[in-house]
Structure formats: structure tokens, C-alpha cells
Amino acid sequence: MNSKVSSPTLLEALSSDFLACKICLEQLHTPKTLPCLHTYCQDCLAQLDIGGQVRCPECREIVPVPAEGVAAFKTNFFVNGLLDLVKARAPGDVHSGKPTCALCPLVGGKSSGGPATARCLDCADDLCQACADGHRCSRQTHKHRVVDLVGYRAGWYDEEARERQASQCPQHPGEALCFLCQPCSQLLCKDCRLGPHIDHPCLPLAEAVRSRKPGLEELLAGVDSNLVELEATRVAEKEALALLREQAASVGTQVEEAAERILKSLLAQKQEVLGQLRALVEAAEEATRERLTKIERQEQVAKAAAAFARRVLSLGLEAEILSLEGAITQRLRQLQDAPWTSGPTRCVLPQLELHPGLEDKNCHLLRLIFEEPKQSPKDSGKGGAGTQGGDEAQGQGDDRTKIGKQGGAQPLTPKEGKDQNPQEDDGVFIERGNRPNKKKKCKGRGKSVSREPSPILRPNLEGSGLLPRPVFSWSFPTRMPGDKRSPRITGLCPYGPQEILVADEQNRVLKRFSLNGDYKGTVQVPEGCSPCSVAALQNAVAFSANAKLYLVSPDGEIQWRRSLSLTQSSHAVAAMPCGDRVAVSVAGHVEVYKKDGSLATRFIPGGKASRGQRALVFLTTSPQGNFVGSDWQQNSVVFCDGLGQVIWEYKGPGLHGCQPGSVSVDKKGYIFLTLREVNKVVILDPKGSLLGDFLTAYHGLEKPRVTTMVDGKYLVVSLSNGTIHVFRVRFPDS
């Protein structure tokens, strides 16, 4: 992999968001650089000062604030120089909108200068035509570069202006920095040189940069090398997880096919094995997600520091490079010497084992075994230790094959399998359709001899048999031949028996589908409307779009519309169980409208004491007429009655630190909550207790967006790619 990264250009630095503060999102004002090399406005950093510490908003590193305050953080001369160049290209006279000459008031006694037509790149002054013609007629200004103002504003002379730009001494305004005091590592102007530093050895800026730049470049190369290693580790982690998912899906299919051929008395064992598979994948996902988060955070921190250092080295002036040299050196050395992540996790893969006594009802016919994946050919030569371990595993596998052929070994129970070392499961005997096959041996896929291997993932076999479980029913795409763009599903609702209505905001249409994916046409929406959330009433459809609530007939005729608050980017819509009222979330409260368009009620969940403390992004209703909402301000799921009284509110660890997503309620009152960031749908009981995961990536979830419940028993889930999955909710007592 090529680790060489191209240097940024001046145009990229001026046109990108590099000069924007990541806190206030405005152009940097009085930029201050933290030790992690992230730059923010001085006033913005002052707002983050808590107890003498500042947490960097980008890398989350905690930085102690100097005793003098945030103003004592290092001033970023590099960013200041770029900001000066940007400001110089902006319109000058705020009243007339036209730039004026900077010299006319000085030489002619006028209160204001004439219209500027040129600019001196050395003086950084706008000049009128007369002043521009005579500007280079003196000895001091003979070598100055005067350019056309229009071309300067267009950016034609950015590179030349940057080269002629001089960093100003903060102690002596108007004096350029031109020396580096070696003992003090401080930039000096001529006046500073004759002051306290007169006896100190000093170097001109150009000479100082030549002596120190190679050291910075060497540190930067080291960080680039670590970035390549981080990227390779991240890719290997994702590949290992993809392999595990593929194998788990394959084994799941085998389990389903085997269970269909046996008696109903084996269903309990079938569910147990599927639960083991889900536990295995979920355990692997959880562990991998934590490692990926750490890897991506390290990668982001290293990239940001390297990008900053690269910009300074390629675009900075001598004074700027030297002013930041200490901070950059410290940060790059810190990143280069920091401990990096270990190699990719060695995981065990499940395999299905069928016992010979298939007709024995007292025998566990379905059981999972776990083995490490076979090493890829390109890694076969890496490290003798891994090959030796594979040979040992092969020998163990041969012994187990012999035992299996003798028929004297009984399959391990799940409890016994828990205590067994997964590394010793290589080459175990597996019987499929009464055909013995010796499984592949593992040679340490992704193992690095220079690092400690990550612990092997063990599946959590402690299933909860009382949870409702999903039964996959249908899956279908929502993109139709007439769509100009890929669908973006922002709303779902039931629309008649076993039919759904899909709000495709990207294509500005409401689509009708049966649960098995048959396209039923559309419900017309007003021209220019992009439906966001949707709900079906009796012979009418309500949807929100562009801060308005619409009620239309099935043929698209507008019955009424209501304006909503502009403080909320989207408004969730839900139909009441009676079918003649619709609820909509508006700026933290809920408004309920009758079918004739009159306002029935308005309430804030929790009453007036919660005013301004709620942000209901998703909303639904229960069969009993209660409301369930995802509150992004409180990061919770709130359950309230029709008067707004909060019955319960869930903020537990089951949210995995994510913002709660779409919510749906089945006929028994169970709440199905979408957690998009972790590819999960979790289930809560009617009292607000978290029961566990209902859907995960094992079930094909990839960035789920919105859900709805049809006929009280079908959970419909839309994905970010426009695909819809339909699952039937099966309870243990059904």
C-alpha cells in the first residue's frame, strides 16, 4: 500500500473548511491551537473551559488550560496568514460595497480614498489608479508587486501574495518576524533582536527552517507509516466480521433446512441453536465495534495531526513553521510512539453438526461447533509460529476424526462447549447427511508475530427463551422504474390489510406496496412536496412536508393543510387508533388534529415543566391510545398518555449510547425501537423494561431507518438503501 500522501494546495486550504471553527462553524476568529493540533476560536475555547480543562471536540483529548487562560494557548500564525489572505479578497467598503484606496487619505488629506483598481501585494493595500501608477517610484517600494484588483479578488495572485506575506510581530506592530532565538525558540523581529535577546544566538528564518524541517518530515513519515498499518488492521477487522456473518448465515440456513425435516419436538433445540448463532454474531459485532471505534479514533487523530503538519510544512512561511515546530514535533512524536492496536481478531466460525441418531428425541440433533478460519494463501508465509500451530491443530483434528468414526463420542452440550478452548476445536469431526467431513485447519488468519493476538471471541449462549422472536417473511426493493433517484424512505405506515404506504422523500412520492412487495401505485401529493412522515386515517392520508401538515384523500385531493414550527427540520406523524385523528410532533410538544382540521389537543410530555426540554424526532401510538416518542434532547424513549402525562421513560444502557430511532408498537403493547448506529431493533415491554435485541445485522439489518407495525404482528423495517424487510413477530406462547 502506498503510504505517500500528496501535499495540500493553497487553493484547497482557502476553499475547504480548514479555516472554519468546528465549534461555531464560522470563520476562525483569534485562532488558538491545542496541543493535539486542532484549532478553534479563542472565545469558543473559553466556553469549553470546565474546571481548568478543555476537551477537544474532534479527538476528545483532555487538555489542561494554562493559568493565564485559553488566551495562553499557542497562536496559530499559519491560520492567521491564510485568514488575512481570505479577508483581503473580501469586499472592503461595507457601505458602498466597493473597495477604496488606502493611500489617498494619507497623502491627499481626503476623508476617504477613491475607488481602488489595484493592490500592492507587499504592502497589502488597495490602491486607486493614480496611487498605483506612482507606487513603485520610490526606493522603498521599487520592488513591490502591484496587480489588478479584479484579478486579485478572483484568486489569480494567491500564491504570489502568500509568498510576499510577512508575519507580524505581536510585540511590535508593523515589524515583520525575521529571526529565531535558538535558546528561547522564539520568533523575533528586529526590535526584539536588539532587546532581551541581543546576546542570544539567533538564526534567520530561512536558515532555521532548513535545519529543522528534515526532523519534522521524518516524524511525519513515521506517522504516515502507522496510518497505513491502522488502515490495514481496520480492513482486516471488517473482512473477518464479514466472513463470520456469511458463515453464520450459511449455518443458519442449514439449521432451518435440518429442522424442517424433523419432528415438532425438535423445535426447542432448533431455537436454541439459532440463539447461539445470534449470540455469536452479536458478541463478535459488539467486540469488533469497540475495536473499530478505537481504531478509527486513532486513525482520525493521526490523520488530522498529519494533515495539519503537512499543510504547515507545504504552505507555511518560515516564521509560521518555526512557531509551530515545537507543538508539531511534540504531537507527531507522541503519535509515532503511541501504542497502536493489535492485529485483527482471530475469531471462531460456527459449523452445524448433526448427530447420527436423528430419530432419538432425547438427543441434541443440532449443535454448533467453532473453528478458526483457514489462513489465506497470501498470509501462509508469515511467521513460522502460525504454521506450527496449524500443524498441531491438524493433528488434534485427526484424533477427533478417529473418535467420531468409532461412534463412541457423544456431542458436547452447550454448557460443556462453553468451557472448551475454541483454539482446540480445529479439525473437529462433522457429520452432514451421514457424510463425515474433516474441517479445515486454522493457521492464524491475520495473526502478527510482532504483536499480541486479540482474544478469540466466545459466543454468549445464555439465551432468553421468553423473548418474542422474528420470523422472516418478505424482502423487496422500493425503487420503481419511474424513480429518478435512489429512494430515501423517511416514513412508513399501514395502509389497509397487509399493505403499507411508503414515504419516499427523495422522489417526492407516496408509494403503496403489499407486504410481499407487490407495487400498488401511489397516493398523489401536491407538486413540490417531499413527504417526510406519513400516517393513514379513515379514507385519508396525513403526511408532513416542508414544515406543513397535509391531509389528502386517497386520490390526492388536499382536504386541509396546517403550518408547523420551522424550528424543527422534520415532523413525525402518527395516526390515533380511532382512525379519525392524527398526531404530529412540533418543537418538543405534540399536537392532535381532528379529521376536519381542527386542533383537538396540544400537550408537552411531562407538562409545562418540560417546556424546551423535549425533541420528539419519532412518534407512534399504541393500540390503547398512548404515545411513544424518541426524544433526542433527553436521549430517551418516552411513553405518555393522551393528556401528556409521562407513564415511563427509558434511558438505560440498552441504547448503546445511540440516539433512539423509529418506534413501533404491536397489538400486545410491546415497543420495537430502532438503533440505527448499531444496526439493531431492540424490544421493550409495555412497562418500559428492556427485554433484549429483536433484530440485528444477523437478520440482514444494514442502517435501518424507519419501522411500522402492520396488523399488530408484522414489523416492517426500511433500510437506507431503499430495501424493505418484513418480519412476523412470534411470541413463545403462540
UniProtKB/Swiss-Prot annotation:
Residue intervals of every RING-type zinc finger in the record: 21-60
Subcellular location: Cytoplasm
Domain of life: Eukaryota
EC number: 2.3.2.27
Induction (free text): By interferon.
Record's function text: E3 ubiquitin-protein ligase that plays a key role in innate antiviral immunity by mediating ubiquitination of CGAS and STING1. In response to pathogen- and host-derived double-stranded DNA (dsDNA), targets STING1 to 'Lys-63'-linked ubiquitination, thereby promoting its homodimerization, a step required for the production of type I interferon IFN-beta. Also mediates monoubiquitination of CGAS, thereby promoting CGAS oligomerization and subsequent activation. Independently of its E3 ubiquitin ligase activity, positive regulator of TLR3 signaling.
Entry similarity comment: Belongs to the TRIM/RBCC family.
Name of protein: E3 ubiquitin-protein ligase TRIM56
Organism: Mus musculus
Name of the gene encoding the protein in the UniProt record: Trim56
